[in-house]
């Protein structure tokens, strides 16, 4: 089982739409897919057609990641009603905001990772839709992830947010979860022939090099229509929707290639403990641990994004 977080530290870049597009690509390929909705707006839950009252949600899982709670928080998406395969969602909740502490403890950020050990054999791919912030929910998602896909739009503020995201991922990788890495930067909502957009795309390619994925998603109404109708883009009619679906297939291929040589099993409880430095104490915050473990000269703010990731 592989885990991919879809993230951006800037809101409004189409992060949830990208997460759903990737889920559509994985589902259409026959992968057993789980989407975890950690964004308190719960748009991924709605987009997957999971509407109603639920006994358990992500908020409950993050409070107590026990086997029965984890399984009750996962429901089937309406996407799979007329197709074979698995596409499920761990239901989002506004109550998850209680777990979005800007200074989460080590115990708190490990809870989603613990929860995923309860469904290790049930899924091939887990996609996490994260909030547009670097607080507890996003860090919890990253600790449980193998890769982070950074979604960016071609704008100045998005470029700045992308830089912050890269450095934050690298800080967490060095301090707590060595398997974590950036899959790449996906440029979304490109407006063709818009000079400012073209300038920012070129700027990102010059700044981040190979981190910028070759696939660029243009702003198209078909994608918004499919998402708004709680339908998978791969099942939405029309030539344009099939072109969009093919682009998400390309991004999924990049993810699967990145996962190819990686261990798929989640670490056991003993292994998780072994990964932690011995000086981490119960109740210590993640920021305290990362600051304590930093070595002189390792400040990611002094490195380029490519250098920070060892590229």
Regions found by a protein language model. Give the residues of each.
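P-loop NTP-binding core
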Residues: 1-311
């Amino acid at each position: 089982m592989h885990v991919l977080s879809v993230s951006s530290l800037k809101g409004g870049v189409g992060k949830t739409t990208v997460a759903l597009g990737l889920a559509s690509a994985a589902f259409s390929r026959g992968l057993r897919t789980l989407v975890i909705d950690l964004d308190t707006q719960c748009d991924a839950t709605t987009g997957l057609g999971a509407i109603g009252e639920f006994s358990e949600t992500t908020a409950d899982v993050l409070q107590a990641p026990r086997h029965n709670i984890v399984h009750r928080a996962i429901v089937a998406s309406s996407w799979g009603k007329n197709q074979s395969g698995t596409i499920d969602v761990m239901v989002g909740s506004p109550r998850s905001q209680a777990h979005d502490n800007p200074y989460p403890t080590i115990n708190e950020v490990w809870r989603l990772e613990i929860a995923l050990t309860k469904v290790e054999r049930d899924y091939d791919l887990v996609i996490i839709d994260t909030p547009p912030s670097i607080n507890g929910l996003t860090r919890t998602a990253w600790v449980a992830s193998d890769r982070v896909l950074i979604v960016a739009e071609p704008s100045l503020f998005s470029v700045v947010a992308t830089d912050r995201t890269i450095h934050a991922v690298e800080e967490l990788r060095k301090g707590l979860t060595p398997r974590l890495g950036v899959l790449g930067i996906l440029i979304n909502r490109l407006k063709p022939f818009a000079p400012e957009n073209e300038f920012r795309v070129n700027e990102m390619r010059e700044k981040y090099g190979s981190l910028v994925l070759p696939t660029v998603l243009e702003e198209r109404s078909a994608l918004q229509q499919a998402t708004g109708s709680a339908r998978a883009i791969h099942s939405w009619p029309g030539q344009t929707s099939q072109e969009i679906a093919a682009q998400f297939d390309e991004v999924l291929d990049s993810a699967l290639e990145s996962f190819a040589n990686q261990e798929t099993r989640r670490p056991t409880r003993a292994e998780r403990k072994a990964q932690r430095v011995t000086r981490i104490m119960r109740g210590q915050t993640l920021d305290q641990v990362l600051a304590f473990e930093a070595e002189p000269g390792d400040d990611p703010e002094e490195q380029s994004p490519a250098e920070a990731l060892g590229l």
